[in-house]
Amino acid sequence: MVMREETIKSLEDPYKYHYKEEWLNTKDPDEQQLFEIFAFGNIKDLPENIILTSLMRSKLEKLTLVTLSEIYNELSYELIKEECQIEDDGIIESHLIQLQNIFKAEMDSVSKSMKFSRRFDCRDVYCHEKELTIIKNPRVTKEYLVQNLRSWETKLKQNILE
């Protein structure tokens, strides 16, 4: 797969974590698959035939970590290593520091765990604008968000406002 320089720069940009717009706008099928993975997928979704630069791989590890932060409040380094396919604790800690504008996390190097205390951003939301070709079951969909908001609204009305 040959990637345009513009695509490589976008995927390697250390401050960019949202790729839905690129996924929607690209006409190239190979780039579309790559942007799909970066917008909605995790490192385990990456097909073996797609080779990433080290910076792109690092970005996908971080995006996978953002996904984990949306699911769990507390994580062990072992789970992070498994899900992000990272072998070194130092890389995990470096990623956590680099993601400080996405979430606030407290690291415990002794117990090799971490806790998320605040979240400032999340992954892209799939709203069925286009058919997915790589990701089978996107975690965050428009329906998922609407359901959670309705649930929260019900809880608010029943438990807090009464």
Curated annotation (Swiss-Prot):
Keywords of the record: Cytoplasm, Nucleus, Signalosome
> Does the keyword Cytoplasm feature in the UniProt annotation?
yes
Complex and partners:
Component of a COP9 signalosome-like (CSN) complex, composed of at least RRI1/CSN5, CSN9, RRI2/CSN10, PCI8/CSN11, CSN12 and CSI1. In the complex, it probably interacts directly with CSN12 and CSI1. Also interacts with RPN5.
Other remarks in the entry: Present with 358 molecules/cell in log phase SD medium.
Q: Where is the PCI domain?
A: 6-118
Keyword 4Fe-4S applies: no
Protein name, entry field: COP9 signalosome complex subunit 9
**A GO CC term?**
eukaryotic translation initiation factor 3 complex
Q: What does this protein do?
A: Component of the COP9 signalosome (CSN) complex that acts as a regulator of the ubiquitin (Ubl) conjugation pathway by mediating the deneddylation of the cullin subunit of SCF-type E3 ubiquitin-protein ligase complexes. The CSN complex is involved in the regulation of the mating pheromone response.
Q: InterPro entries, alphabetically?
A: Csn9_fungi (IPR016806)
Q: Where in the cell? A: Cytoplasm; Nucleus
Write down the species. Saccharomyces cerevisiae (strain ATCC 204508 / S288c)
The GO annotation for biological process reads: adaptation of signaling pathway by response to pheromone involved in conjugation with cellular fusion; cellular response to pheromone; conjugation with cellular fusion; cytoplasmic translational initiation; protein deneddylation; regulation of protein neddylation
